[in-house]
């Protein structure tokens, strides 16, 4: 049974990927395993109580397992309980790739769209910078997630998030023609590109040392600066300063990691579009895991709010 199809208090069984497995202890000092399971429809947490040494050795992150259990809701959070686990037998599903959440849009379609939109960057300085960095990180950009957790945290999530933002910018610029389309496109295409440096990759994603210590905003600004030097572009040109500005401030507030606040329209719009797409993905992901008439689990990145799934046709 798919995770997104599980109903409250329903017994289920099926094959799932262990996304994470943490060994913990109860107050009484007994071992238990805290899991996050996933399939291509979503994720759900569960615990294996009184974990024995052979359980701890066998059920590790990255492995596919057969699981029986009951889907429950605790503190508005869906979870699986009363679980029994075993490893797959010969002939049963065991390829982790089959259990990963995938982009709703095929990566080839995303690649074709992004290539098309790069041509629409009319400013030659911005287009050269974008082309250079997209060539440098082509493989990583079209495979990495956009985050370890929260929004677009799946393989190709980075490219899907970026392409969706470009689509939104394209539509918004028709309503507000005073916006510079080329700056919007270039800024969006580069704003999260350094996630390919900040994160380890699409499998069991973690932060790299540079990701932990510097973060993707500082990393992409450094990449742009190096690219400008390599291309022989004057780094004091207004185009370079504006491009760096819209990227440095795309988190909006200083407390969210941006070193400066937005000072031009395009910077403000990119921040809003980024927040819109991230919020929609987080809400949609959480709502897919609950039934109509239920609340989602609390979403930490959205002020720890729960969201209601209307009981409507």
Q: For each of these PLM feature ranges, what is it?
A:
Residues 1-12:
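OB-fold nucleic-acid-binding modules
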Residues 10-27:
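Structural detector for short beta-strands of small beta-barrel domains
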Residues 16, 62, 165, 274:
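Divalent metal-coordination and catalytic microenvironments
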Residues 22-31, 44-45, 51-97:
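OB-fold single-stranded nucleic acid-binding module
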Residues 34-39:
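Short, acidic/hydrophobic/Gly-rich beta-strand patch recurrent on exposed beta strands
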Residues 68, 271, 288-289, 293-313:
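N-terminal intrinsically disordered, cationic/polar leader segments
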Residues 92-213, 237:
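Acidic/His-rich, divalent-metal-binding segments that scaffold phosphate/diphosphate chemistry
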Residues 150-151, 160, 171-290:
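Divalent metal-dependent catalytic cores for phosphoryl transfer on phosphate-bearing substrates
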């Amino acid at each position: 049974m798919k995770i997104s199809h599980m109903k409250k208090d329903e017994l289920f069984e099926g094959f799932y990927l262990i996304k994470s497995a943490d060994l913990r202890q109860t107050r009484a000092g007994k071992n238990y395993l805290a899991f996050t399971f996933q399939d291509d429809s979503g994720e759900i947490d569960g615990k294996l109580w009184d974990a024995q040494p052979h359980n701890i050795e066998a059920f590790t992150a990255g492995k596919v397992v057969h699981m029986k259990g009951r889907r429950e809701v605790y503190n508005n959070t869906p979870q699986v309980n009363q679980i029994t686990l075993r490893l797959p037998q010969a002939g049963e599903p065991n390829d982790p790739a089959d259990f990963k959440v995938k982009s709703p849009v095929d990566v080839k379609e995303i690649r074709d769209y992004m290539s098309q939109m790069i041509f629409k960057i009319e400013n030659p300085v911005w287009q050269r910078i974008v082309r250079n960095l997209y060539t440098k990180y082509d493989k990583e950009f079209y495979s990495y997630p956009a985050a370890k957790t929260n929004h677009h945290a799946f393989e190709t999530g980075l490219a899907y998030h970026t392409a969706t933002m470009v689509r939104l910018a394209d539509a918004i610029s028709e309503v507000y023609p005073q916006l510079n389309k080329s700056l919007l496109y270039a800024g969006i295409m580069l704003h999260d590109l350094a996630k390919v440096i900040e994160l380890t990759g699409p499998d069991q994603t973690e932060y790299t040392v540079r990701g932990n210590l510097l973060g993707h905003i500082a990393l992409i600004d450094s990449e742009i600066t190096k690219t400008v030097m390599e291309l022989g572009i004057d780094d004091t040109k207004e185009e370079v300063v504006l491009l760096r500005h819209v990227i440095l401030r795309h988190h909006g507030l200083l407390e969210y990691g941006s070193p400066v606040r937005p000072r031009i329209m395009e910077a403000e719009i990119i921040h809003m579009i980024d927040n819109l797409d991230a919020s929609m993905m987080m809400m949609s992901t959480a709502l897919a895991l609950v039934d109509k008439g239920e609340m989602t689990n609390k979403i930490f990145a959205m002020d720890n709010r729960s969201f209601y799934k209307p009981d409507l046709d």
